[in-house]
């Protein structure tokens, strides 16, 4: 996979801004749940996250966008879905080891 250029990232961010104003995105937010942890979160506090980050080749298309609480979005950063799942598994394993 070739590196993603700054121009490509800017173009995808512009597409994300357009989608953020769409009825489709507003309906997604109206569920008031994080797409990762499913924690109830007011719509105004949900962020738009790219499942496959832009810098890793992701696009601003509906199938790659998910409402995320700020905590999940900040923790996920530039992880791919498989890396994010492994991270969550590690957290669960660590929590199981706590007496």
Language model features with spans:
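Histidine-centered nuclease catalytic patch
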Residues: 38-65
């Amino acid at each position: 996979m070739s590196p993603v250029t700054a121009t490509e990232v800017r173009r995808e961010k512009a597409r994300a801004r357009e989608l953020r104003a769409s009825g489709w995105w507003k309906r997604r937010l109206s569920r008031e749940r994080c797409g990762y942890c499913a924690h109830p979160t007011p719509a105004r506090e949900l962020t738009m996250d790219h499942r496959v980050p832009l810098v890793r080749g992701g696009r601003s298309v509906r199938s790659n966008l998910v409402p995320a609480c700020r905590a999940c979005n900040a923790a996920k950063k530039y992880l791919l879905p498989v890396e994010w799942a492994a991270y969550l598994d590690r957290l669960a394993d660590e929590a199981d080891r706590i007496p």
